[in-house]
C-alpha cells in the first residue's frame, strides 16, 4: 500500500471555480480574446473572494501544458490512484485560493482535514513552491497534527520568498497563444498585484529575519530591504490596493524563523534556470538585472529554497539542464520530473536505502546552441544527509587527460568547456563524455553528459 500523500501546490497553481463548479481560472482563450469577456474576467478575479472558491490543483492548461498532471503521472507509476479532482485512496490534493494569504483559515482547515482523513496513518507532505509557506502556516495553526506527519518532501520551496513575485506584481508577464496576445504586461501586473499571496512571497524584513545568503533586495541607500517595508517602489496609481497587501504581508510574515523544527524533510533545490538574482527599489520603480541561471530553478532562488534548516532537514541540490536520457530541462514547475529526482522519490515514497546523490547536467541552452563559445556543466555531489561528500573530486573524461573538478567541501560545482575542438562521437551531431565522482569511501563512475558538436 502506498504511503498517503497530501499535496499542496504553489502559486497560482489551483483552479478557481464558481458556485456551479465551473472553472473560472485558468480562463479559456475565448475569455481573453473577446474584450468584453476579458474585462469581466479580470473584474471578477479582482473581487476577492467574491463568488469564487478554490478548486483542485491545475492539472494542465488547455489539456496540453501539464501542471500537476506531470506529478500525478509519476505517482501513478508508483501505485497511486488519483481522480480528476486530485484525490484517491492514498492521495489528497489541497487546492487553495491564491488571491488570499498563504495562511487563510479555510486553506489551513482544508490541509488539516486532508491529514485527518488518513488517520491513523501518517502522511507524507509533498509541497511545491508557495506551498511551503502554506505548510508552515498549517504547522503553526495545528501543532497537534505534527505527529501525523511521516515526512515532508519539498520541491523549490519559496521559504524566504522570490523575486519572481515582485517582478509579476510590478512589471507583469504577458500571456499569448499562437502569437496572439491574451494578456498584456499591465493586465498581468494588475491581476497578480491584487493577490495577497504575491506579497506574501516577497523576501521578508531583513531587520527581523536572518536572511543568510538571501540578500536579494536592496533599497536606494544600498542596504538590504523588503518590498513589504520599503514601499517607495509602488507606482502611485497602484498604492491604494498595494499598500494594504504589503502591510499585511509584513505584519504576518515579515519575521521568519529559519529553524524548521524536528520534522524530517527532504528539501529539493534546483539551480540552472534563469532566475532574478537581485532587485533594487527606487522611487516608483524596481530595477532588475538580467536573469542568471546560477541563482535558481527558473522561479525561486536557490538561496531561498535552501534557506530553511533543522536537525532533520536534508537539502539536496539538483542541476537543471540537459541530461543524456532527458534533454528537456525540468524547471521550477516540473522539478519532480528530473532524472536526478528519481532516486529521491524512491527513498521518500518507497523506503529505498539512502545513497549519495551525484548528478551532472549540461546547460540546456548551451548544450544545443552550436554557436555558443562555452558549454556549462553543473555538478552536484552530496552524502545521504545532504552534506558535502568528503574529499569529492569529479573527473570529466573529455580527452586524453581527465579534467579534475574538486568540490572542496561544497555540494555544487561548475565546469565550463570551450566548445571549439570537440567533435561529435555519439551521433552525427552529439559529443558525449562521462564523469567519474570519487570521494572518501566511495565513487560513482561513468555519469554521462552530452551536447551538440560538429
Task: Describe the residue ranges of each PLM region.
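A short linear-motif detector with a strong N-terminal bias
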Residues: 131-133, 243-248, 294
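Acidic beta-to-alpha connecting loop that harbors the catalytic carboxylate
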Residues: 11, 271-273, 296
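N-terminal non-catalytic accessory region
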Residues: 1-186, 298, 302, 306-307, ...
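Alpha/beta-hydrolase fold catalytic core
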Residues: 89-92, 96-102, 199-289
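Low-complexity, glycine/alanine/valine/leucine- and proline-rich hydrophobic stretches
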Residues: 281-309
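Extended catalytic-interface subdomain
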Residues: 151-154, 158-234, 266-267
